[in-house]
Each structure stands twice: as structure tokens, then as C-alpha cells.
Amino acid sequence: MSQTPIKKEESNDQDDKFEFKKYINEGKLPLKADNPKKKPQLGTIQANQPIPSIFDNLFNLFKVINTTYTFLYLRNSLTITFPLLNSSVKQSLKKELTIGDLSQLREICPQIIELNYKSLASLALEINKNVYTDLNPELYTGSTVSQSSEYVLVIELLETQERSSKRRRREGPTMKANIQRQKLDFNNLKKAIELRNQKFLQGIKEYIKKCQLTELDPTQQLLTQSRKNQPVPPDSPSIPNDSIENCNLNTKACSIEELLNEIASESSYEGQIVQEALHTYPAVEAQYGALSRPLSQELINALYTSRNIEKTYKHQADAINHLWNGFHVIVSTSTSSGKSLIYQIPILQSLLEDNQSTAFFVFPTKSLAQDQKKSLIDILSYMPTLKNIRVDTFDGDTPLESRESIIRSANIIFTNPDMLHQTILPNANRWYYFFKNLKLFVLDEAHVYNGIFGVHVAFVLRRMRRIAEYFGNSQYRFVSCSATIEDPLQHMKKIFGVDNIKLINYTSSPSGSKKFVMWNPPYVDPKHPDDGKKSAISEASKLLIKFAEKRVRTIVFCRVRKTCESLMRLVRQELKTKQKGDLLSKIQSYRAGYTVQERRKIESEMFNGKLYGIIATNALELGIDIGSLDAVITIGFPYSLSNLRQQFGRAGRRNKSSLAVYIVETFPVDQFYLKHPILIHTQPNAELTLDLTNEVLLASHLQCAAYELPINIRSDEKFFGNQIQDICEANLEMVEESYRPHPKYLPFPASQVRIRSVSEDMFTLVDVTNDKNVILELLEPFRVALTAYEGAVYVYQGKTFIIRLLNINKRIITAHQVDVEWSTLQRDFTDVDPVRSLMKKTMHGSTNIYFGAVKATLHVFGYFKVNKQKDILDVVDITDHPVEIDSRGFWIDVPWHIIEVLSLKKINGAASIHAAQHALLSLMPIFISNSGNDIRTECKAGEKEYKEAKSERRRPSRLIFYDNCGDSSGAGLCNKAYEHTDELITMAIERIESCDCKVREGCPGCITSSKFEGGVCSGEVLDKVGALILLKMLLCQHVNLDIYADGPEIDSYHALRTLIPSC
């Protein structure tokens, strides 16, 4: 790996360095004699009242620090430390700077000043040595700091650079603006300093006024509060008691209403609660129902002793009665409505009547299976008659030596669809007695079985039904439980292929009241709306900390892993800054990728009340019991209303009042529900998608079925449909009037058919800090390429690690824990190329649209080091290890004359294609149910598209999309989108034309999407106007080029230099 730092632009003005040092030493702004400017004064704060001298002294101190900071940071991106500032203050004010001084400055204006201790090891990683040649190195390394400390205080001034950074990003593509830091002229430096001085002066005025209104002495209040909140190094041997804010960890949790009232009354509250969206679900009383058959007294006693259950709710009783009457049952009710009893009671009663009875309990995740197994065993422990009944887990973690014993003697098996597919069905003869005595087959969380995974599971269950019938058993019953979904009856019919089903879609269990709050982040600066809004992550961090302080047990849902870890990191930083160390161990993150042991530990701590908060992805949407929760915070819309409602249902699971907070983001779907909040409660859920006509997937499962039992067309058509004969003739081998697997699938077809889009070639991430060698998590190759390259800053449980080594052959990644304030962004591009066309259609004249086999290749060739303002601190090259995906997709070859038209307008052709692709992608969920990144496109890299030298990466003028899940046969999603290309393009044109944004890079309302937040695409190379022209011309619509401004390219050559004709 080679490191290439950004070269700093050198000044030709020999006096520049002299002036720079002069102002650093004096802490002054040079003011021209012919244009004097009046310096800010404090005397106008309040008439007839003297200003305490401490504030006047602090204002002078701030001006010196501000001048020093601005020159150092904006010129060289230095990390500004306490020793560095102390040197300047001593020279200018002839006094020593103290940490108490800085704490007082922060107390007056916390929105500008941030103080954090950082380890010397992390600072060493940030130092770009070549920019310190003219400075005393002791100023940075801190020889004045106690040699016993491993930490140094870092100062950051936030207000001015935050807005200017955002403005720079809006002026043009990120790479054009930031690939090399432009030299700031002297006037810009003066403006930055003056603006911050004015902000601090205003902060003093507001601080004194607030104290006067509350009849507090401003000086005494400042001294008390700044001493209380003074930053302390993490390795300090002792922390003064008065410096740690009381977190009220031993007090009773406040009520939801008290919590909301307190939030709204705080000075930091900026009207984030959307009043017209407030909604309260009233408390509901229980309704009970009677079972049609009496339960044994032993089971009645066990239910009462283990769960305090004396009678069944009406929906439970109705479902159980349907099962006893010979029907299959689908239960689609709200979260925490007691669905598990619907299958637990019948199987326990059946075992009392016939101890040879068996049952499969199938769950989508191992953690959910273990949770439900524990619940069932708890009831069984009070039933002595069933003491010999064996309940076991049969999954990938089950030891090989234990499996035969489980097959022979288990009555109830907890498993997952993967084990059914890969182990149980291919070895069906060993399971003869289990299938023969099967009474109940439970498929929990049915809403999970959607899209490509749902199709796979549907075919697996048809294979299971075929085996059971072969062994002479067709009397067992299916029970499927689900969150509230649209048309659950039809969904169960598709999953199981059966008809005699009864639907239970009403809830009769009691529930506490639930308050729904929509939280709209405020503008960074209300006077400058173009600067955008405060991030949803920072708003969530403040809310979560507030809830935890009040002992309100909370779960925060994030769409992607990156958001989950970013939030956890921010929470840890804020808790350290605020000296609330008691809460650090009370909040944890939870997501896929963590080891099983780590997740079980977090689940247990939450269940036992040891945690006040969990930050999670949708891994905790499912019904894992983590105890009683008081509140849910959802960051951004989670792909579907069903997901959103499922997340809201996690709070109030013990009949308590609860709170659901939805923090809206700037993406189109969030803004839609912000304008129409009532639809969150009234709009029907989107239908789940199961495309059982996918002949490629069916053919692969027929290979597996033929291995389990030879296929007979006449008898097996009822399981697999009337297309079975054609598929068998084309893909399987005829042997003695029945079909057997094709030889290429032998010796074991199931091993070649993966039902989940999870790679078997996982990488192991290992923490090697202090030689501890602890496994952190397992990562898929695609995720490794994007987040775990050598040198990357990787976030785990809110802690930052540097990736030290990526061993491709051994699939091992080593990481070292460090405390850094910067992060890394990969420099990457993806090539997506057609391999073979399977279908073709013509759209409006001569434009062809193709569907077929594609290959996607991800290249990560380096990374940027960036600070919190997204300024690039360093550029690093790394060795590229391409990741390839074979899939299915569709593409549109853009005629070259369209690209030439764009070039005449000096509009970048690659940016236009990229913007058009994302405009279409953002609309596909209207026609296809998918989980965010199931369909992807070829993304452009700003570093490649905008560099001045001739680009070696010239791509065809083509819009292309591919299935990112499934195997080489795809997931069927692009096939469906291919059928709607005309509608998609028409809708994209309407969306772009109706969007009010004025920037060429577009906004979340037209051409950008939530895909950018997870690091899948940087969103650098976009041109909204070019996308509109391109899409219109594809539909042969008239385009008046005169109404569109020319693009940013210098000439027509530069506008198309990275493209070649697609055909």
C-alpha cells in the first residue's frame, strides 16, 4: 500500500509566511488604515448594567484562539491541540492558557467550541508531518502536557467551517471541490474569523441575559458550570465528584408525557416535534375466548405457573380451534400479542395424548429460535408427564456427533429454512419417523419470506410437503405467524401451496397507550436554509442520551450498519464530553455481523434491565424478547410501512404506555410522510412479492427434489405446478421413467443452491489491540471491499479501529483500536457489463432495452481521510482486489447522438447517465418489493470522471441495473423492473421536472437516494439537467435545449471524454 498525501499549494508571496506568523503571535486581525472596521464591543448587552470583567477577558481570549485556529486549520487542516493554542496565547496575552479557560469558553458558546481528549496514538495517525516544518514540534506533541498522560486535549471550532463546507459541496461535485484544498485568500480568512467572533459575542449576550432572567449571578454560574463540565482525560486517576453530572441512574423512570414536556421546555429545543403529526393509540382492554376442547389439568397448571396464564385471548382461542378443526392457520396480529401460545398449546396437548408426536418450529434466525425454545422449555419444566420429551435445536451450530441422536429421539425441533434445504430434506430417509409422526409445522415471522428468499423458501416447503406425503402423512397442520401485512392469507397460500387456511388478523390482547411523535430536524442555521438541516443521527443521539438519563428503555432502529455504528460512536463521544460516564455501559449497538456470543450477551443484558438503550438495524425487528421497552426511535423511513409499524411495535410489549419517535430525513419518502403523516396510521401495507414463476429457481429446486425422491411428473405436478414437465425435460436426467438430478449438480445438489444471498467465503475481523486476538465479526467479501480495506477506519460498537492487514488468501482481517476523529471514505468505482442478452424490446423508435446475464465488478483503489465536516485531509492509494458478482439485469443503450447533444451544452455525459440511473432506481419500489439495495447500478467515481488527465476508464453510454441478491440467475427483481421501463422513465421525468431544487447535483427529492447513506455510492457524479434531457430523448419527447443552462464542462470534448458508444 502506498500513501500519497495531498500536496499543499505553495504561496509565491514571500511575505505571506511572515504575516502568518505575525498574526499567530499577536492574535489580531490586520485592518487596513483606509477602511477601518469597528471591533465588536461588549458594552451594549444591557443598558445601565456593567458587564462582568470575566466575560470581557474571555472575549479577548476567544479572539486570540479564533485567529490562531482559523489560520492553522483552514491553511493546513491541523488538529489543534491545547499546547499549540497555549503557545499563541502566551505570546499575545502574556498569560498561560488553562483548561478551565477553555471550559468557560465552551460553557458560553457550546455550539461553536468542542473539547475532546484524544490519545497520542490516534494523533500520530493524523499528523501529516510535512506541514509542521515551520512550527515548533513541541507545540503539537505537547511537551507541556504531563508525561504520565496518554491523552492530549483537542480543540475544535465548529460554526463557520460547517456552513462553508456544506456550501462548497453544493457548488459542484465533491471531488471537484475537495480533491485539492484551494488556497484561502486573506479576505476569506478575515471573514471566517469575524463571523465566529460575532457568534461568540452573541453567545455572551444570550448567556448573561438568561442568567438575569433566572436571577442567577452570571459570573458565579459560569464558574460553577464550567468547573462541573470541565473535560478530564480518560486515563485520569481520579475525577472530581462535582465534574460528573448526576445521571439519575437509581431514580424511577419518568412518564412519557413528563419526558416530552421536559424536552419541549429545554432551551435547546427548536420545535422538532411536528404538532400536526402527533398521534396517540389508546390503551386496549383484553378480550378472552373459549377453547372448543378442554386442556389437560397438567397443561393448565403449567401455563399458570410459568406464565401466569389463566385464560386465552379471543384471537388465540379462535386460532387453536381452527387447528383442531383441521385447518391451517395464518396469524397476522400486532407485536407482543401472544402468537407463540397458538402453536405451543396444541403441540403440548398433542404430546400429552401421544408422546410420539413431533413438530418442526422454523424460524428465520438462530437467535429467534433460541428465544422461543427457551420459552417452550420453561412451560415443559412444569409438566412432569412430559419429562422425557426432547426439545432440540438443529441448525448449523449443532455438533455432528449430536445430530443422529436428535433425529432418532427429538419430539420438537427448532430449525431454520436453510437446514431444511441443505440437511434435513436431502437425508429424508433418516427422518422417516419424525415425518411420519409430524403434527405441527410452524413457520414464524412469515413477513420475512419476501422477494428472492421467500421464493426459495416456498419451493423448500413444497419439497417438504412432498416428502411427508411420501411417508404417508398428510394430516399435519401448518401454523404461520406474522406481523401485520397486506393480504396475509394469499401470502401463506403462496408460501405453502395449500388452500384450506383460516386467517386470524385481529388482536384481543391488552395494550398500553402509545404516543407517536414525528421529529423533524431543524435547520443548521435558520437564516441560511441552503446549509441544510441537522443530521438525523445527531438528533437521535441527543434523544437517546436524554431517554437513557431518564431511565426510559429505548431501542433505536437504523437502516444500515454504517448508520448504526456512526450513531453509537457519536453517543460515546457525547457521553464522554458531558462527563456522563455512568451511561457508557448502558447503551450498546446490535446488528448482523456481530458474533453469536456478543449478540446473546446484549440480548440478555437488555432483557435483565442492565441496558437503557440499544442501537440496532432491523435485526431486532423480529420478535426476540429483550424485555420491556418504553420507547422506539426510528431514523429515516425503513423501506416499507410494514417495517416501520413492526419497529414501533417493539415498545410497550408489557402493557405499558410507550413512545414511538420517527426522525424524518431529507429523502423523498420521508418528506412525503412529513406532508401526509396520517397515512402512517391509515395507509395499507405494501404487498409482499413472491414470484413463483421464476423458472431458474424452480429448476434448481427440482434438482434438489429429484435427489430426495425421483420426480414423477403426474404425481409431483400438484407440488411444483404445470410447468414442471418442460423444466425437467430441459434441465434434469430421465432415468427409468422418472427424473433424476443433472450430473453437474451431483453428488449433492442442495450444496449448489443457496437460498440466501450470503457468501460462504466470509472474512473474519480480529481485534489485535494489545495482542488480544478477539474475533469481532464476520464480513461478506463485498462489504470487506467497501469498509475493511487496509487503512480504513472501521467502527464497531461505537469504537474506532484501523484496519492493519487484509489477508485475502486466509480471509483474515486484523484491526487495532484507536481513538480518531477522522474517518475514511473508499475511492471506488463499479463496472457493470452485459454478458448475454436473454430478452429484448424496442422503446419508442430505435432504442433497445435488454434483459440478460450481467457481471458487476467492484474496484476499491484507495481512500480519503476526512474530518467531521467532510473536508479531505489525505488521499491514500491501496492495492485493488476486485470483487465480482454474476447476476441478471437489464440495460438501455443510450444512442450516441444523445450524448453529443449533451456535450454541445457542455453537460457531462457520465454525470447525466449516473443521475438518470438513480432517478429510475429510486422509483423501482413502486413496482417491486425489495429491501433497499437489492437492485444496484453502475456508479461513477468523481476521481475518475473529473481528473484533468486522459481517463483510462471509458465506459459505454448505457443505463444498466442488476440484481444484487440471489445467484447468477438473479432474484427476478430486474426482470420485473424490465417490464415497467416505460412507466419508470415517464415517472422519473415528472419527478425531476417537479422538483424545486436548483443545483445540478439534484437532491433526495429527484435524483439522489438513500443508497448514498450506506456508502454504496458517493453521489459525486450527477447532473440533474443532463438526466432530464437524456430521459426525454429516450422517449422521443421534444426537448427545447434553449431553456436549459449550459453545463459546467469547459467544452464539448470534456463533456464526453469518459464515454464511448454503447454499440
UniProtKB/Swiss-Prot annotation:
Gene: hrq1
Domain Helicase ATP-binding: 320-503
Organism: Schizosaccharomyces pombe (strain 972 / ATCC 24843)
Major subcellular location class: nucleus
Span of the annotated motif DEAH box: 444-447
Region: Disordered, residue numbers: 224-243
Record's protein name: ATP-dependent helicase hrq1
Binding sites annotated in the UniProt record for ATP: 333-340
Deleted gene: phenotype: Leads to hypersensitivity to DNA interstrand cross-linking (ICL) agents mitomycin C (MMC) and cisplatin, in response to both chronic and acute exposures.
SUPFAM superfamilies: P-loop containing nucleoside triphosphate hydrolases (SSF52540), Winged helix' DNA-binding domain (SSF46785)
Domain (Helicase C-terminal): residue spans on this chain: 539-717
Biological processes annotated in GO: interstrand cross-link repair; nucleotide-excision repair; nucleotide-excision repair involved in interstrand cross-link repair; UV-damage excision repair
Localization, UniProt: Nucleus
Keywords assigned: ATP-binding, DNA damage, DNA repair, DNA-binding, Helicase, Hydrolase, Isomerase, Nucleotide-binding, Nucleus
Function: Helicase with 3'-5' helicase activity involved in genome stability. Functions in the nucleotide excision repair (NER) pathway and plays a critical role in DNA interstrand cross-link repair. Unwinds relatively long duplex DNA up to 120-bp and requires a long 3'-tail of at least 70 nucleotides for efficient unwinding of duplex DNA. Shows both processive helicase and DNA strand annealing activities. Affects telomere length by a non-catalytic mechanism, probably through inhibiting telomerase by competing with it for ssDNA binding.
Quaternary structure note: Forms heptamer rings. Interacts with rhp14.
Family designation: Belongs to the helicase family. HRQ1 subfamily.
PANTHER family: ATP-DEPENDENT HELICASE HRQ1
